[in-house]
Amino acid sequence: MAKELPEHFARHGANLILLDISPEIEKLADELCGRGHRCTAVVADVRDPASVAAAIKRAKEKEGRIDILVNNAGVCRLGSFLDMSDEDRDFHIDINIKGVWNVTKAVLPEMIARKDGRIVMMSSVTGDMVADPGETAYALTKAAIVGLTKSLAVEYAQSGIRVNAICPGYVRTPMAESIARQSNPEDPESVLTEMAKAIPMRRLADPLEVGELAAFLASDESSYLTGTQNVIDGGSTLPETVSVGI
């Protein structure tokens, strides 16, 4: 959703700061600017607090301030618990937890000083609500984001900061496609088809649907929401078990 979320916020009139480890993010910024949106790209590694702090400093020098933070960086590598290496475990933790921690810590002080700020965390139904074989490290990190969301919401509510989490099910994104390729390299599309069959709405989410939820949580229309888990999964967490009936 690294492309769709910025596009959605831009359509709502937001001035954008895009932070990514890949210089490719500059192409997306140029594309959005070419459509008349205001957009700044900064290249940084969310695992490195110094890199994040320098990037945020450069962005604020150009844009002035940051009102909304959407923590969307995330990775998922499949592997059974016993087969997963320490490097794979730490890869998830460094990006999915420490990355969120580092960016939030860099942005939050300015929000507190203004007594106004909105933070949207991208978690998942995996981890805190459900689990899939082969996603132990991913589940660990996404459950942690729910805990971080609630803790920050309580700690900084009186400072005018709202913090909410989005918990998607399967979304048709490069990450979902990567999981499908890892699961069945010869026919990844069949994996995505089977994913959809297990969802009551019989389809994966469109990234723009998640973007609409993120925009709502970042807007004044959600002014009394903080510390919430917002599930957007087409009903996939509702069935007690796989249906054997109609």
Language-model segments: what does each one mean?
Residues P109, V154-Q158, S223:
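Alpha-helical segment proximal to the catalytic Tyr-Lys
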Residues S124:
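Residue(s) in the substrate-gating loop at a strand-loop-helix junction
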Residues T104, T141, T149:
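Active-site helix of classical SDR
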Residues T226-I246:
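Short C-terminal tail/terminal secondary-structure segment
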Residues S80-F81, D88-I93, M195:
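Substrate-binding pocket helix/loop in short-chain dehydrogenase/reductase
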Residues M1-I17:
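Canonical Rossmann dinucleotide-binding motif of NAD(H)/NADP(H)-dependent dehydrogenases/reductases
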Residues V43-A55, D86, L208-E209:
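The beta1-alpha1 cofactor-binding region of Rossmann-like NAD(H)/NADP(H)-dependent oxidoreductases
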